[in-house]
Amino acid sequence: MIKFLSALILLLVTTAAQAERIRDLTSVQGVRQNSLIGYGLVVGLDGTGDQTTQTPFTTQTLNNMLSQLGITVPTGTNMQLKNVAAVMVTASLPPFGRQGQTIDVVVSSMGNAKSLRGGTLLMTPLKGVDSQVYALAQGNILVGGAGASAGGSSVQVNQLNGGRITNGAVIERELPSQFGVGNTLNLQLNDEDFSMAQQIADTINRVRGYGSATALDARTIQVRVPSGNSSQVRFLADIQNMQVNVTPQDAKVVINSRTGSVVMNREVTLDSCAIAQGNLSVTVNRQANVSQPDTPFGGGQTVVTPQTQIDLRQSGGSLQSVRSSASLNNVVRALNALGATPMDLMSILQSMQSAGCLRAKLEII
């Protein structure tokens, strides 16, 4: 019986506090990606490129490229090209990226090209914020969308003016790294939390000795590390695999005002309240009537008279009671019982928070 109770208590403790690795909760300060950008040309399009008369920069770029290849275009030549498109190329330089390593690039049209499907990106230098070239991109573009048009009608699925080249850029310059320099490293929490920062510092101190880690603020934990790259790599690997008990998160409801989606975590609770939600709809219908004279030679004129009809409907919402809910399932069940649409639910949640019935932070993105 005692063993059973001990196992039950241990089960309750483990379910209440979930253990996670430090590497899943933090990142090393300074070890991050760097954005690269470049401007280039895509060729080989099946008549879906830029209209060069409306995008003069495409023709100018093509002339510059041809001149670098030793081809001179006569002055005043008006090239009507349909298989070339000017594009912007973006990529992310990973931390500790080495020369010869390949990275993915994203290609996006900046002109009026209809599609980049089947195109090939010509050699494009990718620069950082310091205007230095860190990678060279080139390759065939993979476009996830599809489209067709005929007789004035068109059908399109997903985006056609952007694509991706897997391993399409080669790193030519390495970023200088400060890793291994100094005797301290800073771990940054993914989400600021004073208690979590202190808990991580205490866990490191218990394993590595007192004074090995210090919580500087709600996001930063400073760790003392041995000097040298190899020693710091081994030390950091041991720290990242340590496990800490994750405390309950802040109750939060996130609302996307553009799509109408509502997402909430399991810490959200509701207090008892009463809600009445009414809908107001206005419909405007306009129809053009044609009035013609009865006698063709009477000198009358054909007149178009508009006829407008406005219909206003308001559906009254009855007062509904929402019970206090302490779990996420009960919260979802209570909100579904209101029968509100996602757009209505957004205003209901805002009103509930103002009334003090929603025990959560409301974030609108």
Curated annotation (Swiss-Prot):
The keyword Signal applies. GO terms for molecular function: structural molecule activity. Its main location: periplasm. Residues 1-19 form the signal peptide. Keywords: Bacterial flagellum, Periplasm, Signal. The basal body constitutes a major portion of the flagellar organelle and consists of four rings (L,P,S, and M) mounted on a central rod. It comes from the Bacteria. The keyword ATP-binding does not apply. It is found in: Periplasm; Bacterial flagellum basal body. Assembles around the rod to form the L-ring and probably protects the motor/basal body from shearing forces during rotation. GO terms for cellular component: bacterial-type flagellum basal body, distal rod, P ring; outer membrane-bounded periplasmic space. This is Flagellar P-ring protein. Belongs to the FlgI family. GO terms for biological process: bacterial-type flagellum-dependent cell motility. Coiled coil: none annotated.
